[in-house]
Curated annotation (Swiss-Prot):
Ranges for region Type DYW motif: 590-684
Type E motif: annotated segments: 483-558
Family membership: Belongs to the PPR family. PCMP-H subfamily.
InterPro entries the UniProt entry points to: DYW_dom (IPR032867), E_motif (IPR046848), Pentatricopeptide_rpt (IPR002885), PPR_At4g14850-like_plant (IPR046960), TPR-like_helical_dom_sf (IPR011990)
Pfam family, one: E_motif
GO CC entries: mitochondrion
Main function: Acts as a regulatory factor of isoprenoid biosynthesis. Could bind RNA.
GO biological process, one term: root development
Record protein name field: Pentatricopeptide repeat-containing protein At4g14850
Length: 684
């Protein structure tokens, strides 16, 4: 070592950076101190400053700088660059201005580091000052300086300044165009990003993987399927179809555009996959409501030892929430704890949402309370959980903590959807109308179709069907399927067939192929005893070739899902299930229970109607749960359609008769049956 020259020592310091070896760096520094004159040559001092700052030892880097009498712009830039690279943005700016106090002029490498620090700290005024200095020093025309200044303006939300600077850059390179396109997407301006890409191609620009990914994000945000497919063709022609990041972008794009089969094909044909690839397809499945596939893929990724991220876990927790997969959700929660990501904002919010949608509101509250940091999504998730349970008082209490009344975040569009849904399910008409009116007057939020639908649903549940119709007629926007559907359901519940027919006609115009609309109208006529019209609607449904979606109920026992259909006799325990149901019916009839036959769909004799409703899928699932689950465990049933009136009455009676807690999640809300009472208070 004693024979090593200064150049060789400098090379060793570069190797220390490449190998991320602080030990090697310190050994070389010790050799420099021992063998060379003090202070070392300026270029060697600069190597030392660069090594310490890049390896995230800022104090050592600053000390070497202070002990170097002949420090120059390279010395300062080495320090500032390393500080910015390692996230010490405030310190980087302090050193930048200290350099200026010493009269050192920044160069083409110093300015980008300073702009990066300003962008990260969101300091627009400081950014403008440094921009002015770059102009004064004649550096702003450098493509790298100009690009970093442009990026700074974008990240500090100074759009006009960013656009002006972009137009003034004389020679835009690929990085400049990438910065423009990427920042336009990040800033919520996908159309501008697409227009920039088209202009870039017009001047014969050649995109790289960053360009392709940014453009795909723009197409995803704008849901522009055709344009994205054209880009996919360009990806193939340009040879980027083997690039992992581009393939990941394509998976995400097709998923958001509801082309999940295309996402699957790209994933399957990828030669090399990374953790983002798996995560992208899981998220795509969730976005397309294919929750079971998302869960299966997640379990496959665990077997393949794919690195787990907080985004992956939050995505699969959303899948568990969608299919009410409580057991799987709990196991993923345990994995999140093991991976030390359960308290991140993404995973924490997903846990709050998952437990709320699985009917475990206490677990949802606990996950919420244990989060060190909460944002608007977290609060909306808990309010949504309360809404599913019809706990309007708890939802309103959490809402009161938000701005402007409280110190929490300001409510947004989705906050009010959950609040109004809670009011609807609890029958809190007065509160619901006050909240709806406050959206514009207090919060400046324009109500959307979901909010109007909640109000119609709320009024309809409360029996104010005519008022709900008058509300629809006064809507400033065109009523949607959900609005007319809420009115039609209210007509079914309260025996208003003529108004129900009007709602159905509007539904048929908006979505003529949805079998649910025809079934609901048929039920409305059946509830009013107008059997001929009910059967006519059913026959029309068959005549146009529209098939009614099958109703399913399922229950999980010992990590195995058991699914049932109405009149299903295929289960291995069918004999025991039928015996249990018959026994329960006999006990209940002896106690005065009579089946609710008003919504039986056919003009049958009373005995036939009773047989019709006695084998609904949720009753079969309940009987199986009573046979299979211990007394201390609640019976949790999920149904893909709304629970019928007779099953609702049956479940209330059973919960009191056998002293079991029964939790049913249908396609509308949760029902917690206990001691003969339902949490919905018969509003559903």
């Amino acid at each position: 070592m004693s024979l090593l020259s200064a150049d060789a020592l400098g090379l060793l310091l570069k190797n220390a950076i490449s190998a991320s070896s602080m030990r090697l760096g310190r050994v070389v520094h010790a050799r420099i101190v021992k063998t060379l004159d003090s202070p070392p040559p300026p270029f060697l001092a600069n190597y030392l400053i660069n090594m310490y700052s890049k390896l995230d030892h800022p104090e050592s880097a600053r000390l070497v700088l202070r002990l170097t009498p002949a420090r120059n712009v390279v010395s300062w830039t080495s320090l500032i660059s390393g500080l910015a690279q390692n996230g010490h943005f405030s310190t980087a700016l302090v050193e930048f201005f200290e350099m200026r106090r010493e009269g050192v002029v920044p160069n083409d490498f110093t300015f980008p580091c300073a702009f990066k620090a300003v962008a990260s700290l969101r300091l627009p005024v400081t950014g403008k000052q440094i921009h002015a200095l770059a102009v004064k020093c004649g550096r702003i025309l450098d493509v790298f300086v100009g690009c970093s200044a442009f990026d700074m303006y974008c990240k500090t939300r100074l759009r006009d300044d960013a656009r002006k600077l972009f137009d003034e850059i004389p020679e835009r390179n690929l990085e400049t165009w990438n910065a423009f396109i990427s920042n336009s997407v990040t800033d919520g301006r996908p159309r501008e990003a697409i227009e920039a890409f088209i202009e870039f191609r017009r001047i014969d620009g050649h995109p790289n993987s960053i360009t392709f990914c940014a453009f795909l994000n723009a197409c995803s945000d704008w849901l522009h399927l055709n344009l994205g497919m054209q880009l996919h063709g360009l990806v193939l022609r340009s040879g980027f179809d083997t690039d992992v990041s581009v393939c990941n972008g394509l998976i995400d794009f097709y998923g958001k555009c509801k082309q999940i089969r295309s996402s699957e094909i790209i994933f399957t044909e990828m030669g090399t996959k990374n953790a983002v690839s798996w995560c992208s397809l899981v998220a795509a499945y969730v976005q397309n409501h294919e929750d079971e596939k998302a869960s299966v893929l997640y379990l496959r990724s665990r077997k393949d030892i794919v690195e787990t991220s907080d985004f992956m876990i939050s995505s699969v927790l959303s899948a568990c929430a969608g299919m009410a997969g409580l057991e799987l959700g709990r196991s993923i929660h345990a994995h999140a704890v093991k991976a030390c990501v359960e308290r991140t904002i993404f995973v924490g919010s997903a846990l709050v949402d998952m437990y709320g949608k699985c009917g475990c509101i206490e677990d949802s509250e606990q996950a919420f309370d244990e989060m060190p940091e909460k944002n608007l999504v977290t609060r909306n998730s808990l309010i949504g959980g309360y809404a599913h349970q019809g706990q309007v008082d708890m939802a309103l209490a959490l809402f009161e903590e938000m701005a402007p009344r409280g110190c929490g975040p300001t409510p947004n569009y989705m906050t009010f959807v959950s609040l109004l849904s809670a009011c609807s399910r609890a029958g809190a008409v007065e509160n619901g109308m006050k909240i709806f009116d406050s959206m514009r007057s207090t919060y400046g939020i324009e109500p959307g179709a979901e909010h109007y639908s909640c109000i119609v649903d709320m009024l309809g549940r409360a029996g104010m069907v005519e008022r709900a119709y008058e509300f629809i007629k006064k809507m400033p926007i065109q009523p949607t399927i959900s609005v007319w559907g809420a009115l039609q359901n209210a007509c079914r519940m309260h025996g208003k067939p003529q108004l129900g027919l009007l709602a159905a006609e509007n539904l048929f115009k908006l979505d003529p192929k949805d079998s649910g609309n025809h079934v609901l109208l048929s039920n409305t006529f059946a509830a009013a005893g107008r059997w001929a019209e009910a059967n006519t609607v059913r026959e029309e449904l068959k005549g146009v070739g529209i098939k009614k979606g099958a109703g399913y109920s399922w229950i999980t026992v010992k990590n195995q899902v058991h699914a049932f259909q109405a009149k299903d006799r295929s289960h291995i325990l069918n004999k025991e299930i039928q015996t249990t149901l018959a026994k329960l019916r006999n006990e209940m009839e002896a106690a005065g229970y009579k089946p609710d036959l008003k919504l039986s769909l056919y003009d049958l004799e009373e005995e036939e109607k009773a047989a019709e409703v006695s084998h609904h899928s949720e009753k079969l699932a309940l009987a199986f749960g009573l046979l299979s689950l211990p007394l201390s465990v609640p019976i949790r049933i999920t149904k893909n359609l709304r629970i019928c009136g007779d099953c609702h009455s049956f479940f209330k009676f059973v919960s009191g008769s056998v002293k079991r807690e029964i939790i049913v999640r249908d396609n509308n809300r949760f029902h917690r049956f206990k001691d003969g009472i339902c949490s919905c208070k018969d509003y559903w």
